[in-house]
A protein has these predicted regions:
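Catalytic glycan-binding domains that act on GlcNAc-containing polysaccharides
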Residues: 1-196
Length: 202
């Protein structure tokens, strides 16, 4: 695994995007809608580490509550704090307690795939997933496509059934975050050409 989660941090390529779209059976706007809502379409922090969100309730469940305490391990969601480097501070605390469970308790990359879903994303273990996520946004998006197919959410994306997609991808509390509404809005913008220029991002 790359030291401190730093790999090549290569930006999304046109070929990588096209491969994911073909795998999913969608066009560009559907994919950009998801990526825009999850990470504003960027899978890496400025320092080159993958975008993550550490989720304390997942860590609590995976460790059977052995470390329940404050912001890194609790039965209830929340306590995330700001996005960005702060999430790695939280992850570091969890890593010192149970490394594998900690990696599984964070969502990773451009589509924020949970580490515990590594198998559905196409990896033999979470360590392999994190290593790939640290290298390229192409690998991050490929993992998203694999997960959507394995979870049968690809059909909802193809049909623009944003409510069903939001429920499956974001969880039962999706409405609190207006997740489906935001997806619909981002899709509308992407459908009229408001999408990132991959050549500029490269």
């Amino acid at each position: 695994m790359p030291m401190e989660f730093r790999g090549r941090a290569t930006a999304l390529s046109a070929n990588g995007f096209a491969a994911a779209a073909q795998k999913l059976g969608t066009k560009a706007p559907e994919i950009w809608a998801v990526l825009a809502v999850e990470t504003s379409g960027c899978g890496f922090l400025p320092d080159g580490r993958p975008q993550i969100l550490f989720e304390r309730h997942i860590f609590s469940r995976l460790t059977k509550g052995r470390f329940d305490e404050g912001d890194i391990c609790a039965r209830t969601p929340g306590g995330d704090g700001p996005t960005g480097p702060h999430q790695y501070e939280r992850l570091a605390k969890a890593l010192s307690l149970d490394r594998t469970s900690a990696l599984k308790s964070a969502s990773w990359g451009i589509g924020q795939i949970m580490g515990e879903n590594c198998a559905m994303a196409g990896f033999p273990d979470v360590q392999s997933m994190v290593a790939a996520m640290s290298e390229t946004e192409d690998a991050q998006l490929s993992a998203v496509a694999n997960f959507l197919i394995a979870s049968r959410l690809a059909q909802s994306l193809q049909a623009h059934d944003w409510t069903s997609f939001a429920r499956g991808y974001n969880g039962p509390g999706y409405a609190k975050n207006n997740y489906d509404v935001r997806l619909r809005g981002e899709y509308a913008k992407a459908s009229v050409g408001q999408t990132p220029d991959l050549d500029v991002r490269a």
